[in-house]
């Protein structure tokens, strides 16, 4: 697992209060991890803060799984 993936996973565990074992690449924030729309917005904000990036709303809407988040951040992190 990459450093970015590990950091993303840690943020999700912290913010959603889920078990680390539940946070898989394929896990959907809403369907698998129980996030609501506010939780998802807060996750995006945490990713922006943690990685020093800005995620436009149109891109944030496409980030629905742990893998989506990791891929986006890996492609856009400074």
Swiss-Prot record:
One annotated GO molecular function: acyl binding
Signal peptide limits: none
Gene3D superfamilies associated with the record: ACP-like
Record-level GO cellular component terms: cytosol; membrane
Carrier domain mapped to chain residues: 2-77
PROSITE patterns in alphabetical order: CARRIER, PHOSPHOPANTETHEINE
Key words, A-Z: Cytoplasm, Fatty acid biosynthesis, Fatty acid metabolism, Lipid biosynthesis, Lipid metabolism, Phosphopantetheine, Phosphoprotein
Coiled coil: none
InterPro entries (alphabetical): ACP, ACP-like_sf, PKS_PP-bd, PP-bd_ACP, Ppantetheine_attach_site
UniProt pathway annotation: Lipid metabolism; fatty acid biosynthesis
Principal location listed in the UniProt entry: cytoplasm
Key word Electron transport present: no
GO biological process assignments: lipid A biosynthetic process
Modification O-(pantetheine 4'-phosphoryl)serine, positions: 37
Cellular compartments annotated: Cytoplasm
Post-translational modification remark: 4'-phosphopantetheine is transferred from CoA to a specific serine of apo-ACP by AcpS. This modification is essential for activity because fatty acids are bound in thioester linkage to the sulfhydryl of the prosthetic group.
Described purpose of this protein according to its UniProt entry: Carrier of the growing fatty acid chain in fatty acid biosynthesis.
Family: Belongs to the acyl carrier protein (ACP) family.
Listed name of the protein: Acyl carrier protein
Organism expressing this protein natively: Phocaeicola vulgatus (strain ATCC 8482 / DSM 1447 / JCM 5826 / CCUG 4940 / NBRC 14291 / NCTC 11154) (Bacteroides vulgatus)
Name of the coding gene: acpP
């Amino acid at each position: 697992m990459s450093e970015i993936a590990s950091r993303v996973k840690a943020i999700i565990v912290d913010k959603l209060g889920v078990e680390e074992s539940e946070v898989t690449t394929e896990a959907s924030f809403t369907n698998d991890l129980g996030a609501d729309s506010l939780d998802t917005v807060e996750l995006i904000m945490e990713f922006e803060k943690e990685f020093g990036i800005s995620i436009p709303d149109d891109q944030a809407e496409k980030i629905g799984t742990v893998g989506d988040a990791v891929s986006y951040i890996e492609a856009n992190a400074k």
